[in-house]
Structures are given as C-alpha cells and as structure tokens.
Amino acid sequence: MDHRLLEIVACPVCTGKLYFNKENQELVCKVDGLAYPLRDGIPVLLENEARALSLDEKHA
C-alpha cells in the first residue's frame, strides 16, 4: 500500500483516518470499527463491502 495514498484516503462513513492492515490487506477505520478490503491493490471504500471489526481488533 502506497503511503501517499494513505495520506489522502478517508473513511467514507466518518471521514476519519484509515490504517493499513498488511496481514489482512485491509484499510481499517477504528472509529467506526470497519475494515475495507483491497482488491488487486485498490481500496474498495464502500460501506456495504466493509467488514465489521471484532472486539479484539477494535482494541488492538
């Protein structure tokens, strides 16, 4: 994931900062508890495509 892209993308729900989870290849919004997938290296920033974080993931 290009760090320059991380500087400009935002959560589509709350417009907050997204963090890259390298292990799961996801962009994570800790505020909303959502993880957005990457497909072929492209972030899919659609709320209906996001995965809800588990309680453990939210507090990690």
Swiss-Prot record:
So which domain of life are we looking at? Bacteria
SUPFAM superfamilies assigned: Trm112p-like (SSF158997)
Q: Write down any Gene Ontology CC term.
A: cytosol
What's the short name of a Pfam family annotated to this entry?
Trm112p
Q: Which cysteines form disulfides?
A: none
Q: Which HAMAP family match?
A: UPF0434 (MF_01187)
Report the PANTHER family cross-referenced here.
PROTEIN PREY, MITOCHONDRIAL (PTHR33505:SF4), ZGC:162634 (PTHR33505)
Q: What family does the entry list?
A: Belongs to the UPF0434 family.
Annotated protein name in UniProt: UPF0434 protein Spro_1718
Query: Which species is this UniProt entry from?
Result: Serratia proteamaculans (strain 568)
